[in-house]
Amino acid sequence: MVVDQYEVPAYKEVNPGLFTSISFPFLFGVMFGDVFAGTLLLSAGLYFCCAPQTPGSVAAAVAPGRHFLLMMGIFSVFCGIIYNDFTSVSMYLFGDSCWEMPAHGSNTATAKPDCVYPIGLDPTWYMAQNEILFVNSVKMKIALILGVL
């Protein structure tokens, strides 16, 4: 469907449809990594996959792209967990972070010894002064690494 909108491959040409059907939703999830919005997309995809497709209904109109919606939701939730993003607010899934917050009058947080946050960005980064610079840098680096792979 996505490849045919651009151009139908000629005889003896490789059809990139299989590659595109996986890479397009995955790269969408990398760009749109948010757990809440991904869950909404995932639930819409599940609904359209399970809904009866009577002629003239919305489910029949969305039927060609229902699996794309489902996969875009799955990958968006996955990347949202990696980015630790839930409606642009960090999630404290594993209790405290690996940083000790400073006492009054100090601007420097100190790392707890031998502490690694289990998955995703440490939520303390969302309270840092350079939050936007750091988080956008991490997202760009992840997108570049995954895009090259």
Show where each model-derived region lies.
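Conserved, carboxylate-rich catalytic/transport cores that coordinate ions
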Residues: 1-149
